Amino acid sequence: MAAAGLIAALFLCAFAGAEPAEDITAQCKFNAGSGRKTFAKCRDRNYETYWKTSNGEKCYVEVTVPEGQSASGVMTQWFEHPHAWGVQVKDADGKWTDAGHTEGEYLAEYLPLPEGTTVFRVANAPGEKRHFNLTELRIYGEGDTPPEAQQWEPSASKADLMLIVAHQDDEVLWFGGALPRYAGQEGKACQVCMLVPSMPYRRLEFLDCLWTCGVKNYPVWAKFPDAFSYSLAKAYKRWNKNTVYKTVTEWIRRFQPDVLLTHDLQGEYGHGAHRVCADAVMHCLAAAADVKKYAGSAKQYGTWDVPKCYIHLWKENVVDMDWRQPLDAFGGKTSFEVAEEGFRRHVSQQKTDYHVEDWGPWDNSLFGLYRTLVGPDEEKNDFFENLN
C-alpha cells in the first residue's frame, strides 16, 4: 500500500507540474501544397496578411516538428470568413487520414493532435473544397493546452450578461473590467454583440481581447458599415433606424440577457455609432417584450423582458464599479489590469489616443441603472444585485 501510495503521489506531482505548451511554429518545417509564394504570410503574426492556397487536393501544408519533439495542437486564425479545416496524420499504410476537424464556425480555432505527433497536415475538413485564406498558423509543442489557444463555445443560448457595442475595442475602453470580472472570474455567460464588423484584422484582434478577458461565448456582428459622425441623426442617415431596431430587438430575444450593458447616450466622446447603440437599446427593451413588434424574431425566439439594463455614464441610479479588486482567475490581477491587457490585443489601435480609464470624463466604471424589474440597487457594486 505504501508503494502504491508513493507511485500515486509521484503521478499527481508530475501532472501538477505540467507546463503550457510553447509555440514552436518558428522551429517547424513546412511543405505547402500550393500558394508557396504567400505561405510565409500565415507565420508573420500580422493579421493584415494571409496565405492563399489553391482549391481541392492541394489545399494543405505538411508540418514536421523539430527532431526530438512532438506537437500537441494547432491553432488557426482566418481572414474574413471561418473555414472548415482539420489535421491529418498517416495511418499504418502511410495514407493521410483525418485526425480531427472543425465545422468552420469560428475565425479562430484550436485542434489537439494525437499524442506523439511529429509529422502532420493542416488541410480542408472532409467534404470542404474551398481554398484557404489563412491569416495565422500556430503549432504548439508538448505540454498542456496553452491559455492563448482559443476554443470558442457557441454564442450563448441564454446570456447572463450582454454587451451591445459599436466597434472592436469598445468592449474594454468603455466597459472596463466588466468582462474580466463576470466572464473570467465569475464564469457567467457573457455575450458581446457588435454593430460594425470593421476590417478582418480588427475582428481577430477583438477575439484575442475577448479571450484574454475570459469570454468563452463567440461574439456576433451585424453588418452596418463604419462611418464617423458626431450626431445620432447623421448616424441614422447612414444606417436605417428600423433595421438597427430590428437587429437589436432580435439580439435581445435571442440571447435573453439578465443584464444588458451599452454605450453612453451621448456617445462617450460623441461618436454617432455609440449614440445609436444607446438609443436602440432604450427603444428595443420595450420592443423585445412586445410580441407585436418585429414578429419574425418574436416567432423564432419568443419575447424577452430584460430584468436589468445599465447605460454607461447614465446620470440616474448611478453605480460606481470597482475594477481594482484582484481576481483569482487571473492570478491576482485586477479586472482593470486584465482589461488593459485585452486592449493591448487590439494591436492596430495602440498608436491612438484611446486608453482603458476608470477616471476622467468617460470613466468606464460609472454606469446608471436605466431599467430594472427586480428593484433598485442598494449595494451598487454588482450588476447582478437582486439577481444572484
Predicted feature descriptions by range:
Residues 111-254, 282-286, 290, 301:
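Active-site rim/loop-helix segments in enzyme catalytic domains that contact anionic ligands
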Residues 244, 248-269, 277:
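Proline-aspartate-enriched helix->loop->beta-strand connector
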Residues 4-14:
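Bacterial N-terminal signal peptides
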Residues 96-113:
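Extracellular carbohydrate recognition and processing domains
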Residues 17-71, 78-85, 91, 98-101, ...:
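Disordered, acidic Ser/Thr/Pro-rich linker "stalks" and the adjacent N-terminal cap
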Residues 170-174, 198-200, 267-272, 317-320:
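Active-site environment of divalent metal-dependent phosphoester hydrolases
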Residues 269-285:
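Short Gly/Thr/Asp-enriched flexible loops that form oxyanion-binding sites at enzyme active sites
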Residues 19, 28-41, 152-153, 182, ...:
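The feature marks non-catalytic terminal segments
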